[in-house]
């Protein structure tokens, strides 16, 4: 895995797939934001949070980066508790 600091061993298939997707975004800044968050928090996310994380990974990098770093306000359907955890985790 590109950049991941943890082993995917012991993670279920869904979490392993999300870990790979988080680290292989296409925009290096988002690799670091989402990949580091996934390394640290993915194993402990609930099923609902995993679903939310999957939806966040579908958002184009440029848009997600603007929301994460606060240059644009995230829409209400994106500004979930999980999104706020990602923003708090990322030092912007």
Regions found by a protein language model. Give the residues of each.
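Positively charged, polar, low-complexity stretches
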Residues: 2-92
């Amino acid at each position: 895995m590109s950049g991941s600091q943890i082993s995917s061993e012991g993670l279920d298939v869904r979490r392993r797939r999300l870990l790979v997707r988080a680290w292989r975004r296409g925009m290096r800044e988002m690799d670091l934001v989402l990949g580091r968050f996934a390394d640290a928090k993915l194993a402990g996310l609930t099923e609902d949070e995993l679903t939310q994380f999957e939806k966040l990974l579908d958002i184009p990098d440029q848009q997600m980066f603007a929301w994460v770093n606060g240059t644009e306000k995230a829409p209400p359907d994106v500004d979930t508790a999980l999104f706020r955890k990602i923003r708090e985790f990322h030092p912007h």
